[in-house]
Every structure is written in structure tokens, then in C-alpha cells.
Amino acid sequence: MMTRKMTKKELRQQIKQLKGMTPEAVKHVEASMVFKTIEKMQVWQQAQHILCYWSLPDELPTHETVRRWLEAGKSIYLPRVVGDDLEIVPYHGAQSLDDNNKFHIGEPMGDAVDTSCLELIIVPAVALDARRNRLGRGKGFYDRLLSSTSSPTIGVVCDFQLVDEVPIEPHDRPLDCVVTSDTVIVDEVKKALFT
């Protein structure tokens, strides 16, 4: 008997329910494990210019990681929503964030930079799969951003957000790497970057 594939909307709803049952402490432990794994990768060690994200309450927490990476001497960039697109803006500390925007997300203030400076992109997701496909929130912000750059990409989620299959569209492009607290999935062609 064949089971019907979930739609993007159904998968988003299922993950939302699971997120609601996941204690905050568990998310922070998983985030710590995820980012410690990334910090051991060659791509992170060699990258000076890293795009991360300032996490929302339902995303893998990044606030401490972003601060720690900045203190370690990395140049950190965060996205800022402008219309239907994301601008990339340098992060200079919590004082440079503004949450007075449409989504009430901590976004960096200042001038945007070109994506060509980025050497690594950390990507949030609602769900990821073993083929490194990503399900976002449905607005296409990261789809558009990632289509404009060839920088290495790492998708990060809690373990329960790694699913059997993410529904994809013809324009969707898989990420280079997926990291959860106990799983690393890498594009074989780019494997050397993520060791």
C-alpha cells in the first residue's frame, strides 16, 4: 500500500505541532551540538564572512552562537527583509539590531553588502531531508537569496525537523550540508569542505 506524500502546508503544520511540544532547553542543547559540529568543519574554520540568522522563538536558537562567533573574530552577517527579498547586513552586536519591522525579527541596521563576500551561509528551515532539500516558511526569501550565490550552505534544524521527504518544486536547489544534533548529511561533491 502506498502512502500519500505530504504537501508543504501539511508538513509545516506537523512540524509546528512538534515544535510546540519541544522544551526550550532541548532546543538550546541541540543548537549547542549543531554549532559545535559546524565549528569543527573546514568550511567554518576557513570562512571569515559568515551569514547566519537571528533566530525566532520557533527556530534553532542562534543568539549565543552569533555572539560567540563575532567574539571569535568572524565577520557575521544577518538577513534583513526588504520587500520580497533579503538584504545582507553586517552584525556588530545586539545594539545594532532593530525589531521594529513587519515580522518583529531582530534585523541588523546599517548598509547592505553584496552576497559575493559570503564564505558560508547558515540557513534556517522548517524541515530538511536526507537529500538536503529545505522547506522554509513559504515566502521564498531564502530561495531567492540562495539562487543568487554559490557560497557553501548549511541547513540547521532540531532532530525532529529532519524528515523523510520535503516536497520540492523544479526551482528548488538542495543545500550543500544538513546538520542536526546527531546527523550530518553532505553533498558528496563538496564533502571535503565539511570534514
Language-model segments: which ranges?
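N-terminal active-site beta-alpha-beta segment that forms phosphate/nucleotide-binding
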Residues: 2-116
